[in-house]
């Protein structure tokens, strides 16, 4: 379980997050949504251990987070892949740094590549892949170390609409298969409503938790309902419009 209590953080000397209290249970998919500058990425960087926080606590499985760790896998919007390595070696890179024996890490990489639908592309280089394929590699690399928690920072923001829909459904299937705790940062309202088991709305900076919404659309998808059916459901449309109105309210209030 991820537990965040009374978290305060600065960015560039200015308050970025204020009194953040969140819990992410095992097997849940928490989505954090908010306007630009609300501290979404700062929150993910704090949980990943990339930057320090000033007050409060962040705990994963009862242990305080003080820096990066293998129990947290991170997927970035720009992938962060190594262009001089092929797909297989990119996926295996973290395992190599951890000292995993070569044959074992290559076998794990092969299984992860297969899991994200890139079987047969193991020897391709990153520059030979589409944007969606590169994000699949990023997800496979993050999962290769078998982390407790998967963190994703707007991973589909640069993709076209069709590819983005494919990647959303892939991530939900992986979430169901692995049972991982997942925290997704996004600015896309429809994506947030579709994918979250709990949606957290942040106010403009300094970011505060404005509202927490339990949702069941992701569970409906992994239970077998199509994404098209879900997104055309009046309940889904009503929730999407409600969240949109809340985001616009905050923009108006702080403009």
Swiss-Prot record:
Pfam families reported in the protein's UniProt record: ABC_tran
CC annotations in GO: plasma membrane
Localization of this protein: Cell inner membrane
Residues annotated as domain ABC transporter: 2-229
Positions with a binding annotation for ATP: 34-41
UniProt subunit comment: The complex is composed of two ATP-binding proteins (TauB), two transmembrane proteins (TauC) and a solute-binding protein (TauA).
The protein's role, per its UniProt record: Part of the ABC transporter complex TauABC involved in taurine import. Responsible for energy coupling to the transport system.
Protein name: Taurine import ATP-binding protein TauB
Taxon lineage: Bacteria, Pseudomonadati, Pseudomonadota, Gammaproteobacteria, Enterobacterales
Gene that encodes it: tauB
């Amino acid at each position: 379980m991820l537990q965040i209590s009374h978290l305060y953080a600065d960015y560039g000397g200015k308050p970025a997050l204020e009194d953040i209290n969140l819990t992410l249970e095992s097997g849940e998919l928490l989505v954090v949504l908010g306007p630009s500058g609300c501290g979404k990425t700062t929150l993910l960087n704090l949980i990943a251990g990339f930057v320090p926080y000033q007050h409060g606590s962040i705990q994963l499985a009862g242990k305080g987070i003080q820096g990066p760790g293998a129990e947290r896998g991170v997927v970035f919007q720009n992938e962060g892949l190594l262009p001089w390595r092929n797909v297989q070696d990119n996926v295996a890179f973290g395992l190599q740094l951890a000292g995993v024996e070569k044959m074992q890490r290559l076998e794990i990489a092969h299984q992860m590549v297969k899991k994200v639908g890139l079987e047969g592309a193991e020897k391709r280089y990153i520059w030979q892949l589409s944007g969606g394929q590169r994000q699949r590699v990023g997800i496979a690399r993050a999962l290769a170390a078998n982390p407790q928690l998967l963190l994703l920072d707007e991973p589909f923001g640069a993709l076209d609409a069709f590819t983005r829909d494919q990647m959303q459904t892939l991530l939900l299937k992986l979430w169901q298969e692995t049972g991982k705790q997942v925290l997704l940062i996004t600015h896309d309202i429809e994506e947030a409503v579709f994918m979250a088991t709990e949606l957290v709305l942040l106010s403009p900076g300094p970011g505060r938790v404005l509202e927490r919404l339990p949702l069941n659309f992701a569970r409906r998808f992994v239970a077998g309902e199509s994404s098209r059916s879900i997104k055309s459901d009046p309940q889904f449309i009503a929730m999407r419009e409600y969240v949109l109105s809340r985001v616009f309210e905050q923009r108006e209030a702080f403009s």
